Amino acid sequence: MQKVEVFRIPTASPDDISGLATLIDSGKINPAEIVAILGKTEGNGCVNDFTRGFATQSLAMYLAEKLGISREEVVKKVAFIMSGGTEGVMTPHITVFVRKDVQEPAKPGKRLAVGVAFTRDFLPEELGRMEQVNEVARAVKEAMKDAQIDDPRDVHFVQIKCPLLTAERIEDAKRRGKDVVVNDTYKSMAYSRGASALGVALALGEISADKISNEAICHDWNLYSSVASTSAGVELLNDEIIVVGNSTNSASDLVIGHSVMKDAIDADAVRAALKDAGLKFDCCPPAEELAKIVNVLAKAEAASSGTVRGRRNTMLDDSDINHTRSARAVVNAVIASVVGDPMVYVSGGAEHQGPDGGGPIAVIARV
Protein backbone atom coordinates (compact mmCIF):
# COMPACT_ATOMS: atom_id res chain seq x y z
CA MET A 1 0.00 0.00 0.00
CA GLN A 2 1.34 3.43 -0.90
CA LYS A 3 1.35 6.38 1.45
CA VAL A 4 2.09 9.75 -0.12
CA GLU A 5 3.41 12.69 1.88
CA VAL A 6 3.93 16.20 0.50
CA PHE A 7 6.27 18.84 1.89
CA ARG A 8 6.24 22.51 0.84
CA ILE A 9 9.60 24.17 1.49
CA PRO A 10 10.50 27.85 0.95
CA THR A 11 13.81 28.57 -0.81
CA ALA A 12 16.16 31.52 -0.44
CA SER A 13 17.74 31.01 -3.89
CA PRO A 14 17.55 28.52 -6.79
CA ASP A 15 20.36 26.43 -5.27
CA ASP A 16 19.00 26.48 -1.71
CA ILE A 17 18.67 22.89 -0.51
CA SER A 18 18.85 23.74 3.20
CA GLY A 19 15.14 23.23 3.90
CA LEU A 20 15.13 19.83 2.25
CA ALA A 21 18.37 18.91 4.02
CA THR A 22 16.87 19.79 7.40
CA LEU A 23 13.87 17.51 6.80
CA ILE A 24 16.12 14.67 5.64
CA ASP A 25 18.59 15.07 8.50
CA SER A 26 15.73 15.10 11.01
CA GLY A 27 14.34 11.86 9.58
CA LYS A 28 11.07 13.40 8.40
CA ILE A 29 11.96 12.59 4.78
CA ASN A 30 13.72 9.45 3.58
CA PRO A 31 15.56 10.57 0.43
CA ALA A 32 15.12 7.12 -1.11
CA GLU A 33 11.34 7.66 -1.04
CA ILE A 34 11.31 10.97 -2.95
CA VAL A 35 9.59 10.48 -6.31
CA ALA A 36 9.18 14.08 -7.50
CA ILE A 37 10.15 17.65 -6.69
CA LEU A 38 8.08 20.50 -8.10
CA GLY A 39 9.50 23.99 -7.77
CA LYS A 40 9.06 27.69 -8.45
CA THR A 41 12.38 29.41 -9.17
CA GLU A 42 13.05 33.12 -9.30
CA GLY A 43 14.06 33.48 -12.96
CA ASN A 44 12.14 35.08 -15.82
CA GLY A 45 10.39 31.89 -16.93
CA CYS A 46 11.54 32.47 -20.52
CA VAL A 47 13.94 30.64 -22.85
CA ASN A 48 17.05 31.99 -21.09
CA ASP A 49 15.88 31.18 -17.57
CA PHE A 50 18.68 29.01 -16.22
CA THR A 51 17.43 29.09 -12.63
CA ARG A 52 15.36 26.00 -13.47
CA GLY A 53 18.40 23.95 -14.47
CA PHE A 54 20.43 25.43 -11.60
CA ALA A 55 17.81 24.33 -9.07
CA THR A 56 17.51 20.87 -10.62
CA GLN A 57 21.29 20.43 -10.64
CA SER A 58 21.60 21.53 -7.01
CA LEU A 59 18.84 19.20 -5.82
CA ALA A 60 20.08 16.26 -7.91
CA MET A 61 23.67 16.65 -6.69
CA TYR A 62 22.51 16.78 -3.08
CA LEU A 63 20.31 13.69 -3.44
CA ALA A 64 23.08 11.84 -5.28
CA GLU A 65 25.34 12.39 -2.28
CA LYS A 66 22.66 11.30 0.21
CA LEU A 67 21.72 8.20 -1.81
CA GLY A 68 25.23 7.21 -2.83
CA ILE A 69 24.40 7.14 -6.53
CA SER A 70 25.30 9.30 -9.52
CA ARG A 71 23.48 12.48 -10.48
CA GLU A 72 22.47 10.77 -13.73
CA GLU A 73 20.83 7.97 -11.76
CA VAL A 74 18.99 10.48 -9.58
CA VAL A 75 17.36 12.28 -12.53
CA LYS A 76 16.15 8.93 -13.87
CA LYS A 77 14.62 8.11 -10.50
CA VAL A 78 13.14 11.46 -9.44
CA ALA A 79 11.07 13.83 -11.58
CA PHE A 80 12.42 17.37 -11.18
CA ILE A 81 9.96 19.93 -12.52
CA MET A 82 11.10 23.50 -12.03
CA SER A 83 8.90 26.36 -13.22
CA GLY A 84 10.59 29.72 -13.57
CA GLY A 85 9.01 33.03 -12.65
CA THR A 86 7.93 34.22 -9.20
CA GLU A 87 6.57 37.61 -10.17
CA GLY A 88 4.53 39.73 -7.79
CA VAL A 89 4.25 38.28 -4.30
CA MET A 90 4.82 34.65 -5.26
CA THR A 91 7.27 32.98 -2.87
CA PRO A 92 10.00 30.76 -4.40
CA HIS A 93 9.64 27.25 -3.04
CA ILE A 94 9.79 23.54 -3.76
CA THR A 95 7.14 20.87 -3.20
CA VAL A 96 8.55 17.43 -2.42
CA PHE A 97 6.46 14.31 -3.08
CA VAL A 98 7.40 11.29 -0.97
CA ARG A 99 5.90 7.86 -1.57
CA LYS A 100 6.27 5.14 1.03
CA ASP A 101 5.37 1.46 0.87
CA VAL A 102 3.50 0.75 4.09
CA GLN A 103 1.77 -2.21 5.67
CA GLU A 104 -1.37 -0.29 6.51
CA PRO A 105 -4.99 -0.69 5.47
CA ALA A 106 -6.36 1.76 2.97
CA LYS A 107 -8.01 4.83 4.46
CA PRO A 108 -11.76 5.42 3.98
CA GLY A 109 -12.57 6.71 0.51
CA LYS A 110 -9.83 7.67 -1.90
CA ARG A 111 -6.57 9.27 -0.78
CA LEU A 112 -3.65 11.02 -2.44
CA ALA A 113 -1.64 9.01 -4.94
CA VAL A 114 1.24 10.04 -7.18
CA GLY A 115 2.88 8.46 -10.20
CA VAL A 116 5.85 9.44 -12.33
CA ALA A 117 6.83 8.67 -15.92
CA PHE A 118 9.27 9.95 -18.53
CA THR A 119 8.90 10.15 -22.29
CA ARG A 120 11.75 9.42 -24.65
CA ASP A 121 13.90 12.33 -25.81
CA PHE A 122 12.30 14.28 -28.66
CA LEU A 123 13.92 15.42 -31.87
CA PRO A 124 13.58 19.17 -32.50
CA GLU A 125 11.15 18.59 -35.37
CA GLU A 126 8.83 16.55 -33.12
CA LEU A 127 8.18 19.29 -30.57
CA GLY A 128 4.75 20.89 -30.75
CA ARG A 129 3.47 18.18 -33.05
CA MET A 130 1.54 14.91 -32.90
CA GLU A 131 4.67 12.90 -32.11
CA GLN A 132 4.87 14.74 -28.81
CA VAL A 133 1.11 14.48 -28.18
CA ASN A 134 1.06 10.71 -28.64
CA GLU A 135 4.22 10.02 -26.64
CA VAL A 136 2.97 12.15 -23.74
CA ALA A 137 -0.38 10.32 -23.81
CA ARG A 138 1.47 7.01 -23.52
CA ALA A 139 3.57 8.26 -20.61
CA VAL A 140 0.56 9.72 -18.75
CA LYS A 141 -1.06 6.28 -18.80
CA GLU A 142 2.20 4.82 -17.51
CA ALA A 143 2.24 7.37 -14.68
CA MET A 144 -1.38 6.54 -13.80
CA LYS A 145 -0.39 2.90 -13.50
CA ASP A 146 2.55 3.89 -11.32
CA ALA A 147 0.12 5.84 -9.10
CA GLN A 148 -2.32 2.91 -8.99
CA ILE A 149 -5.08 5.13 -10.35
CA ASP A 150 -7.49 3.23 -12.58
CA ASP A 151 -10.20 5.81 -13.28
CA PRO A 152 -9.16 8.93 -15.24
CA ARG A 153 -11.77 10.86 -13.24
CA ASP A 154 -9.58 10.36 -10.16
CA VAL A 155 -6.73 12.30 -11.78
CA HIS A 156 -6.82 15.90 -10.51
CA PHE A 157 -3.51 17.34 -11.73
CA VAL A 158 -0.92 16.28 -14.29
CA GLN A 159 2.26 18.32 -14.00
CA ILE A 160 4.65 18.14 -16.94
CA LYS A 161 8.04 19.61 -17.69
CA CYS A 162 8.67 19.72 -21.44
CA PRO A 163 11.51 20.85 -23.72
CA LEU A 164 11.72 23.84 -26.04
CA LEU A 165 13.56 24.82 -29.20
CA THR A 166 16.83 26.71 -29.10
CA ALA A 167 18.73 28.18 -32.05
CA GLU A 168 21.12 25.24 -31.87
CA ARG A 169 18.31 22.68 -31.91
CA ILE A 170 16.58 24.42 -34.82
CA GLU A 171 19.85 24.41 -36.78
CA ASP A 172 20.30 20.71 -36.04
CA ALA A 173 16.91 19.96 -37.61
CA LYS A 174 17.72 22.06 -40.67
CA ARG A 175 21.04 20.26 -41.19
CA ARG A 176 19.10 17.00 -41.36
CA GLY A 177 16.59 18.44 -43.83
CA LYS A 178 13.78 18.74 -41.27
CA ASP A 179 11.57 21.69 -40.42
CA VAL A 180 10.43 22.71 -36.95
CA VAL A 181 7.00 23.84 -35.82
CA VAL A 182 8.15 27.44 -35.34
CA ASN A 183 11.48 29.26 -35.66
CA ASP A 184 10.81 31.59 -32.73
CA THR A 185 12.38 29.98 -29.67
CA TYR A 186 10.00 31.67 -27.23
CA LYS A 187 6.93 30.61 -29.22
CA SER A 188 8.30 27.07 -29.24
CA MET A 189 7.64 26.97 -25.50
CA ALA A 190 3.93 27.48 -26.18
CA TYR A 191 3.81 24.73 -28.81
CA SER A 192 5.60 22.26 -26.56
CA ARG A 193 3.34 23.11 -23.62
CA GLY A 194 0.26 22.86 -25.83
CA ALA A 195 1.17 19.53 -27.38
CA SER A 196 1.98 18.11 -23.94
CA ALA A 197 -1.36 19.30 -22.56
CA LEU A 198 -3.24 17.73 -25.46
CA GLY A 199 -1.37 14.51 -24.73
CA VAL A 200 -2.83 14.60 -21.23
CA ALA A 201 -6.31 15.25 -22.61
CA LEU A 202 -5.93 12.33 -25.02
CA ALA A 203 -4.72 9.94 -22.30
CA LEU A 204 -7.56 10.83 -19.93
CA GLY A 205 -10.28 10.72 -22.57
CA GLU A 206 -11.03 14.43 -22.33
CA ILE A 207 -10.59 14.79 -26.10
CA SER A 208 -10.90 12.09 -28.77
CA ALA A 209 -7.91 11.36 -30.99
CA ASP A 210 -9.70 12.38 -34.19
CA LYS A 211 -10.00 15.99 -32.96
CA ILE A 212 -6.28 16.51 -32.34
CA SER A 213 -3.95 17.36 -35.21
CA ASN A 214 -0.83 19.38 -35.92
CA GLU A 215 -3.09 22.14 -37.21
CA ALA A 216 -5.10 22.25 -33.97
CA ILE A 217 -2.10 22.67 -31.67
CA CYS A 218 -1.94 26.29 -30.44
CA HIS A 219 -4.81 27.25 -32.75
CA ASP A 220 -8.03 25.54 -31.62
CA TRP A 221 -8.49 26.81 -28.08
CA ASN A 222 -11.73 24.86 -27.67
CA LEU A 223 -9.51 21.82 -27.13
CA TYR A 224 -8.09 21.63 -23.63
CA SER A 225 -7.44 19.51 -20.57
CA SER A 226 -8.99 20.47 -17.25
CA VAL A 227 -6.13 18.96 -15.24
CA ALA A 228 -2.97 19.49 -17.31
CA SER A 229 -0.22 21.85 -16.16
CA THR A 230 2.77 22.03 -18.49
CA SER A 231 5.94 24.06 -18.16
CA ALA A 232 8.70 24.33 -20.78
CA GLY A 233 12.42 24.60 -20.12
CA VAL A 234 15.77 24.56 -21.87
CA GLU A 235 17.26 22.05 -19.43
CA LEU A 236 15.75 18.84 -20.87
CA LEU A 237 14.92 17.01 -24.12
CA ASN A 238 12.05 14.83 -22.91
CA ASP A 239 8.79 15.31 -21.00
CA GLU A 240 8.81 14.54 -17.28
CA ILE A 241 5.35 13.71 -15.96
CA ILE A 242 3.81 13.70 -12.49
CA VAL A 243 0.25 12.41 -12.19
CA VAL A 244 -1.48 13.41 -8.96
CA GLY A 245 -4.88 12.05 -7.99
CA ASN A 246 -6.79 10.00 -5.45
CA SER A 247 -6.83 6.21 -5.18
CA THR A 248 -8.32 3.48 -3.04
CA ASN A 249 -4.81 2.00 -3.06
CA SER A 250 -3.48 4.70 -0.75
CA ALA A 251 -3.07 5.11 3.00
CA SER A 252 -2.21 8.80 2.71
CA ASP A 253 -3.53 11.42 5.09
CA LEU A 254 -3.93 13.78 2.12
CA VAL A 255 -6.35 14.27 -0.76
CA ILE A 256 -6.38 16.41 -3.88
CA GLY A 257 -9.26 18.25 -5.54
CA HIS A 258 -9.45 20.62 -8.47
CA SER A 259 -11.47 23.15 -10.41
CA VAL A 260 -10.90 25.28 -13.52
CA MET A 261 -10.45 29.04 -13.47
CA LYS A 262 -12.43 30.61 -16.33
CA ASP A 263 -10.18 33.67 -16.28
CA ALA A 264 -7.32 35.21 -14.33
CA ILE A 265 -9.52 36.67 -11.57
CA ASP A 266 -11.80 33.69 -11.00
CA ALA A 267 -11.70 33.52 -7.21
CA ASP A 268 -14.86 31.39 -7.22
CA ALA A 269 -12.88 28.60 -8.90
CA VAL A 270 -10.24 28.85 -6.18
CA ARG A 271 -12.92 28.32 -3.56
CA ALA A 272 -14.43 25.48 -5.62
CA ALA A 273 -11.06 23.71 -5.70
CA LEU A 274 -10.75 24.10 -1.93
CA LYS A 275 -14.16 22.51 -1.45
CA ASP A 276 -13.30 19.72 -3.90
CA ALA A 277 -10.30 18.96 -1.68
CA GLY A 278 -12.60 18.61 1.32
CA LEU A 279 -12.43 22.02 3.00
CA LYS A 280 -15.68 22.99 4.71
CA PHE A 281 -16.95 26.58 4.54
CA ASP A 282 -19.77 28.74 3.25
CA CYS A 283 -18.50 32.07 1.93
CA CYS A 284 -14.88 32.33 3.05
CA PRO A 285 -12.76 29.50 4.49
CA PRO A 286 -11.90 30.02 8.17
CA ALA A 287 -8.34 29.76 9.50
CA GLU A 288 -8.79 26.21 10.78
CA GLU A 289 -9.82 25.02 7.31
CA LEU A 290 -7.05 26.96 5.54
CA ALA A 291 -4.56 25.25 7.86
CA LYS A 292 -5.35 21.96 6.09
CA ILE A 293 -3.86 23.21 2.79
CA VAL A 294 -0.54 21.65 1.82
CA ASN A 295 -0.21 23.52 -1.47
CA VAL A 296 -2.20 25.04 -4.32
CA LEU A 297 -1.17 24.32 -7.93
CA ALA A 298 -2.44 26.45 -10.81
CA LYS A 299 -1.91 27.66 -14.37
CA ALA A 300 -2.03 31.26 -15.59
CA GLU A 301 -2.56 32.71 -19.05
CA ALA A 302 -3.39 36.04 -20.68
CA ALA A 303 -6.58 35.65 -22.72
CA SER A 304 -6.03 35.87 -26.47
CA SER A 305 -8.76 38.54 -26.60
CA GLY A 306 -6.63 40.93 -24.56
CA THR A 307 -9.51 41.36 -22.14
CA VAL A 308 -10.78 40.05 -18.82
CA ARG A 309 -14.57 40.13 -18.44
CA GLY A 310 -14.83 42.70 -21.19
CA ARG A 311 -12.17 45.01 -19.79
CA ARG A 312 -9.05 45.64 -21.90
CA ASN A 313 -5.59 44.92 -20.51
CA THR A 314 -2.12 45.33 -22.00
CA MET A 315 -0.52 42.00 -21.09
CA LEU A 316 -0.25 40.88 -24.72
CA ASP A 317 0.98 44.28 -25.92
CA ASP A 318 3.75 44.83 -23.38
CA SER A 319 7.12 44.54 -25.16
CA ASP A 320 9.10 44.87 -21.92
CA ILE A 321 7.47 42.15 -19.83
CA ASN A 322 6.16 38.95 -21.39
CA HIS A 323 2.48 38.27 -20.80
CA THR A 324 3.17 34.99 -19.00
CA ARG A 325 4.98 36.96 -16.29
CA SER A 326 2.08 39.34 -15.74
CA ALA A 327 -0.42 36.47 -15.75
CA ARG A 328 1.52 34.58 -13.09
CA ALA A 329 1.56 37.63 -10.84
CA VAL A 330 -2.19 38.19 -11.21
CA VAL A 331 -3.27 34.59 -10.63
CA ASN A 332 -0.90 34.18 -7.69
CA ALA A 333 -2.36 37.30 -6.07
CA VAL A 334 -5.93 36.08 -6.57
CA ILE A 335 -5.15 32.68 -5.04
CA ALA A 336 -3.14 34.20 -2.20
CA SER A 337 -6.03 36.53 -1.36
CA VAL A 338 -8.31 33.51 -0.86
CA VAL A 339 -5.94 31.13 0.94
CA GLY A 340 -3.98 33.78 2.84
CA ASP A 341 -0.59 32.56 1.61
CA PRO A 342 1.51 33.70 -1.39
CA MET A 343 3.65 30.53 -1.38
CA VAL A 344 1.61 28.66 -3.98
CA TYR A 345 2.63 27.14 -7.32
CA VAL A 346 1.50 29.17 -10.33
CA SER A 347 2.92 28.38 -13.76
CA GLY A 348 2.50 30.65 -16.79
CA GLY A 349 1.54 29.69 -20.31
CA ALA A 350 -1.71 27.69 -20.28
CA GLU A 351 -2.06 26.62 -23.92
CA HIS A 352 -4.74 23.89 -24.04
CA GLN A 353 -4.72 23.88 -20.21
CA GLY A 354 -8.18 25.06 -19.29
CA PRO A 355 -10.18 27.56 -21.36
CA ASP A 356 -8.57 30.50 -23.13
CA GLY A 357 -7.43 32.96 -20.45
CA GLY A 358 -8.11 30.52 -17.61
CA GLY A 359 -6.49 27.37 -16.30
CA PRO A 360 -6.71 24.38 -13.97
CA ILE A 361 -6.28 24.83 -10.23
CA ALA A 362 -5.71 22.00 -7.77
CA VAL A 363 -5.49 21.86 -3.98
CA ILE A 364 -3.66 19.26 -1.91
CA ALA A 365 -5.05 19.16 1.62
CA ARG A 366 -4.97 17.16 4.82
CA VAL A 367 -8.03 15.11 5.60
From Swiss-Prot:
Q: Where does Mg(2+) bind?
A: 301, 350, 353-355, 358
Q: Magnesium among the record's keywords?
A: yes
In which residues is substrate bound? 52, 83-84, 193, 231-232, 328, 347-348
| Regulation of its function | Inhibited by barbituric acid.
Q: What class of enzyme is it?
A: hydrolase
Question: Would you kindly state one Gene Ontology biological process term found in this protein's UniProt entry?
Answer: atrazine catabolic process
Which residues constitute the catalytic centre?
A: 161, 231 (nucleophile)
Q: Identify the stretch(es) annotated as RU C.
A: 254-367
Among InterPro entries, the record links this protein to: AtzD/Barbiturase, AtzD/Barbiturase_RUA, AtzD/Barbiturase_RUB, AtzD/Barbiturase_RUC
Please provide the record's keywords in A-Z order: Hydrolase, Magnesium, Metal-binding
| Residues passing through the membrane, by range | none
Q: Does the keyword rRNA-binding belong to this entry? A: no
Catalysed reactions, as listed in the record: cyanurate + H2O = 1-carboxybiuret + H(+)
Q: One MF term from GO for this chain?
A: cyanuric acid amidohydrolase activity
Site entry (Important for substrate specificity), positions: 324
Q: In which pathway does it act?
A: Xenobiotic degradation; atrazine degradation; biuret from cyanurate: step 1/1
What are the start and end residues of every segment in region (RU B)?
Answer: 111-248
Q: Which Pfam families match?
A: Amido_AtzD_TrzD (PF09663)
Task: Give the quaternary structure.
Answer: Homotetramer.
Its annotated function is as follows: Responsible for the hydrolysis of cyanuric acid, an intermediate formed during catabolism of s-triazine based compounds in herbicides such as atrazine and polymers such as melamine. Catalyzes the hydrolytic opening of the s-triazine ring of cyanuric acid (2,4,6-trihydroxy-s-triazine) to yield carbon dioxide and carboxybiuret, which spontaneously decarboxylates to biuret.
Domain characteristics, as noted in the entry: The monomer structure is formed from three repeating units (RUs) that share the same structure as one another. The monomer, the active site and substrate all possess threefold rotational symmetry, to the extent that the active site possesses three potential Ser-Lys catalytic dyads. It is possible that any or all of the three active-site serines may act as nucleophile (albeit only one can do so per catalytic cycle).
Q: Which family does it belong to?
A: Belongs to the cyclic amide hydrolase (CyAH) family.
HAMAP family from the UniProt entry: Cyc_amidohydrol
> Which protein are we looking at?
Cyanuric acid amidohydrolase
Q: Which organism is it from?
A: Moorella thermoacetica (strain ATCC 39073 / JCM 9320)
